[in-house]
A protein has these predicted regions:
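A short acidic, Gly/Pro-enriched loop at the edge of an enzyme's catalytic core
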Residues: 102-112
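Conserved SAM-binding motif I beta-strand of class I
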Residues: 65-70
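Conserved alpha-helix/loop element of class I SAM-dependent methyltransferases that forms part
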Residues: 11-42
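Conserved class I S-adenosyl-L-methionine
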Residues: 145-172, 180-184, 188-197
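Conserved SAM-binding loop of SAM-dependent methyltransferases across substrates and taxa
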Residues: 51-63
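A short glycine-rich, Lys/Arg-flanked "PGG" loop and its adjoining helix->strand segment in the class I
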Residues: 127-139
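Rossmann-like AdoMet/SAM-dependent catalytic core
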Residues: 196-269
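Conserved SAM-binding strand-loop segment of SAM-dependent methyltransferases
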Residues: 87-99
Length: 269
């Protein structure tokens, strides 16, 4: 029997939230500030829409045509119900990336967005996504991708490995993701309480774990406990997307474009 989850957490749903960076109109402002002419945005796509809040808001509040998929049928069902009661005309499916990206009825897109997807899927799925962008993004189109970066996420890599190792070896398979997350976090906290050398070298990791423990367990399961989890450097990210014939334009976070707020005079020089 094929595991349709491909190692992704599926026994519990993702959290409900709106992600403003997926808004093509917001992307237009970032591009204009960076000196780029944005596309019209008449055809848009979201890969991995979660509970579908963002894609439904964007479909209902704009004249753009939206196509999107999320392989979790429970989340796709909720997103479709949200579309039916809101009047949003989004085309929503529960297909895997491989299934969705090979469809012949999809238009070419001005905007393709992925939020919380890239770092949490396999290399095989990343290649499917890159090939899809290469074939279906219009000339002059925009891709928004959020991902966990190196070196910022580097201290969390061994911690995350311990979390999943504890889940795989120390908890019952049928106990469910929420219980497994809680048990793994308790283990990490006990480990850090004895002040290992790793905590001395990375003092901020203790506070980070304390902060993580306060977060929603569904979010944590999807953030840290999938089979695939790959923070990567900017250069590696650029290398992945190079074959799709796209390159970095601007950050979706407006304030990151303001050098005086983020860099010293010496760093700017």
């Amino acid at each position: 029997m094929t595991d349709w989850t491909a190692g992704y957490i599926a026994d519990i749903g993702y959290t409900f939230g709106y992600y403003t960076e997926l808004n093509p109109l917001r992307a237009q402002f970032a591009l204009l500030y960076g000196g780029f002419a944005p596309p019209a945005g008449s055809a848009c796509c979201e890969l991995g829409f979660g509970q579908g809040v963002s894609v439904n808001v964007h479909a209902a509040a704009s004249g753009s045509e939206w196509w999107a998929t999320d392989f979790n049928p429970t989340q796709a069902s909720f997103a479709r119900e949200l579309a039916s009661v809101s009047g949003a005309s989004a085309n929503l499916s529960d297909e895997s990336f491989e299934e969705f990206c090979r469809r012949q009825d999809l238009p070419d897109f001005d905007f393709i967005g992925l939020h919380g997807i890239w770092s949490w899927v396999s290399d095989k799925n990343r290649q499917v996504i890159v090939d899809f962008i290469r074939r279906k993004l219009k000339v002059g189109g925009v891709v928004y991708v959020s991902y966990n970066t190196q070196p910022g996420w580097a201290p969390m890599i061994p911690i995350r490995d311990l979390l999943t190792d504890h889940r795989d070896s120390m908890t019952a398979e049928g106990s469910g993701s929420v219980a497994q997350v809680g048990a793994a976090l308790e283990f990490i906290e006990r480990l850090l309480d004895v002040n290992p050398t790793y905590a001395k070298v990375n003092p901020l990791i203790v506070e980070r774990i304390k902060q993580i423990k306060t977060q929603n367990r569904n979010y944590l399961a999807h953030e840290y406990f999938n089979r695939d989890w790959a923070p990567m450097s900017f250069s590696r990210m650029a290398s992945w997307l190079d074959s799709a014939k796209i390159s970095f334009a601007v950050s979706a976070a407006y304030l990151e474009q303001l050098d005086p707020m983020n860099l010293t005079k010496e760093q700017v020089a």
